[in-house]
Amino acid sequence: MNRPILACIFLSALAPLHAEPVFASFPLTASRTLSTSDRILARAFKTKTSGFMVKFQGTVIRKLPDDIDGSRHQRFIVRLNSGQTLLIAHNIDLAPRVSTLKTNNAVTIYGEYIWNSQGGLIHETHHRPDGSKGGGWIRYKGVIYQ
């Protein structure tokens, strides 16, 4: 008689684990005060959505070596207030390098989100080579790199 009751209690205790908030993958600050862009990026990560332009702000947490295969890209990792991390791939054949970039500094970025299992990738942070309007950018210490 005690076994069914224990099983119900055990299963009831596990039930909340299945009702994850959007920010469950990023437990650092699962807060309702997150920016709209942090919420959009968290949802995109959770649903494996890619291919949309987004503007967001984050903190540079790591500088990586440039990717020099094909088009050259300056690479660094940004952490959002949600705790989600994004790899930034900034095409330095089309836009100037963010040469003064330092870790622990804020950066605002407008680029295209591509899903990956580590939080996502942002690219297209440059002007459009065909001269059309649009394109992305990086704002760092008041300077726009496009």
Identify what each model region corresponds to:
Residues C8-P16:
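Bacterial N-terminal signal peptides
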Residues A19-Q146:
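OB-fold and OB-like single-stranded nucleic-acid-recognition modules
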